[in-house]
Amino acid sequence: MNYRVRRLWVVVASSVVPLLAGAAAVPAPAGTNLFGFTAAESGNQRELEQRFDADLNASDLRGWLKTLSSEPNQVGSPHDKANAEAVRDLFQQWGWDAQIETFEVLYPTPKQVGLELLGPTKFVATLKEPPVEGDESSTRTAGGLPPYNAYGADGDVTGDLVYLNYGMPDDYKDLARRGIDVKGKIVIARYGAGWRGLKPKLAQEHGAIGCIIYSDPRDDGYGAGDVYPKGGFRPAQGVQRGSVQDMTLYSGDPLTPGVGATRKAKRLPISQAKTVLKIPVLPISYADAQPLLAALEGPVAPPNWRGALPITYHVGPGPAKVHLTVSSDWGLKTLYDVIAKIPGAQNPDEWVVRGNHRDGWVFGAWDPLSGHVAMMAEAKAIGVLLKSGWKPRRTLVYASWDGEEPGLLGSTEWAETHAEELQHKAVLYLNSDTNSRGFLEAGGSHSLQHLVNDATGAVKDPETGVSTIARLRARMLVRGFDKSASAEARHDAQLAAAGGDVPIDALGSGSDFTPFLQHLGITSLDLAYGGEDDQAGVYHSNYDTFEHYVRFGDPTFAYGVAEAETVGHVVLRMADADVLPLQFTDFAATIAEYVEELRKLTDDKRKSSEELGKLLDENAFSLATDPIRPVLPPEREPAVPYLNFAPLENVVTRLKASAKAYDALHAKLEAGDVKLTPAQIKELNGLLQGMEQALTTARGLPPNRDWYKHLIYAPGALTGYGVKTIPGVRESIESNQWDVANEYIGITAAALSAYCTRLDRATKLLSQGG
């Protein structure tokens, strides 16, 4: 779904060389333990992983990608169902118990869309993506859907046009300072700077009657690089499709929040579905946007609002008047989730769950099939191990999700259907999505941070041959050396110099980890390669094709193999370690940073409010504005009280001590100095399996986001995909809800205290084996 906005953590890459299929691991020094394994176990595990690597083959990935992306495969299409059946059959052939699980979901598809400029000149938008020379796939659009935004309302509206920049909250403040109101208007915003669904949601809340979203060439067209087919970036008539379902409230089927969308499920009327918008929304190309924007007058747009079209950007309103019409079929469609299992030989009730979605907006070669074929390679290699006599300690569950693009439908409905079982059995959910040349990007639960470092530190970059961690540290040091480096880059450079674990990112939303991590509290991880590619230009368009991917994504499929190898090592270690390989010192340090960020956020907000108040009292804004083109002063900000962060600061001190004690005894377990009975191991793993759920709250998050339960990681109410850490406190501070902030300081501190208590129980159990 979202190709790269939620991740900060990166590791590997450079230029293109041919891929040699097979193992690409960097041999660890002899006698070095793998995290979670004794010396003897480490040798066996390395040998297992080498056998796994030897069965990863780039030609497999290429062949699967070409087949799966050969026709449009959106939800409800014949090719989507055919792909599900083909994937199921392959899993069965490889020795997995694979079945298709179906759900019935609300999935609107367009019947009629139209956009025309009525005056001062006339123009009718084409709303089509023509074939591109040299891209045979782009000609095979029969059965595909035209560009549209799913879950925008039906409507036939006419009104003056207003340009909104990116259509985010600060843009409305800038409009207000220019005396412009969007009530009763149709707004046009460019993609970027935040999740697409927030643009029409905010427009709706501000009284707009329709919303148009376009891709400006400055962001992913000729302003970023050569356009397709010369380069990889968005051509003039390329359109980014996408869902505008309000997933800041909940993901999944809009009609069945919190329960699986089975045939017999009780459904809301569409009019009561909170995630379905109330105004029509339509995405367009920059070729179609240019005549609309050129017809605007009113104030000239501020410098940071100006794109790369050869026009003067004006804000409006008018004199441009537009007519927008959207009509959809609002019926139910069937989802086809492929669920494949290998039962655990010793711990069958502990599940390692692995998933990647399969559906696309059109062909979906990049998003999601590049990641999906890597997952298939893992499954095939695991099948070879299985047929050789190996069996995993824990149960493996591999999932090919349907319906991710419209709103994480397949994963959410499956997770909600099996919620109780997952909360008792799942020890990990490991997600992937788009994959391509570049850097390893990892995000997730910070108790997994050390495992990620340990597993990826033994993997070669396919193109440079150096270890991922060594190359990452070099990158971090170089970025921090830049005199204009951000505070984050300088902080990363300090971490690189210190030589400890490289941090993984916190997860917001945008892919199928969301229902597992943020709704159910399952320890989760998201892994991919990317960053040295031109995917942005064809994201969610007719040009996300096999031809584009093999030119600009991963020509040799080296990074597909690297993805399979990296993810496979994590899966195998989680499956086979006697004691779940979690480490808590990194988690404690991360929480300490988040709490310090909250204090700084409050202090900075207070200082800003005071400085703004002083400038307003001195009439500084009115004196500084251009009298010919006046800009109104900003609104006065409320006073910022002093919050009591002591409950969080005190629990952080306890958390650091608890984490240090557990990790020290776990290290002794690896060294063979701690011996546990099978019964003690089972009890210990039971405690560890539920650690992440201790960080959730049954009441959910404010404001009115009860589906989101996680108190440490959540997508922001005003960022969409972007993460907010300690969200109940952070977002309450940002929205000046001081009583709610104080309340969630207490709620979050209590959850972290319960987390410490559970961890202390695990430590006590380990100590009994000394």
Where are these regions (language model features)?
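A conserved hydrophobic secondary-structure block that centers on an alpha-helix together
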Residues: 160-233, 345-349, 361, 366, ...
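Soluble metallo-hydrolase cores and metallopeptidase-like ectodomains found primarily
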Residues: 139-174, 249-366, 380, 384-388
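Alpha-helical metal-binding/catalytic segments enriched in His/Glu/Asp
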Residues: 338, 354-408, 413, 567-570
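Metal-dependent peptidase/peptidase-like ectodomains
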Residues: 122-124, 234-300, 347, 403-550, ...
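Second-shell loop/turn segments in exported
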Residues: 47-55, 69-78, 147-152, 186-193, ...
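Noncatalytic luminal/extracellular "stalk/propeptide" segments of secretory-pathway proteins
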Residues: 26, 30-47, 54, 66-186, ...
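C-terminal amphipathic alpha-helical interaction region
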Residues: 673-770
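Sec/Tat-exported extracytoplasmic proteins
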Residues: 56, 60, 65, 69-79, ...
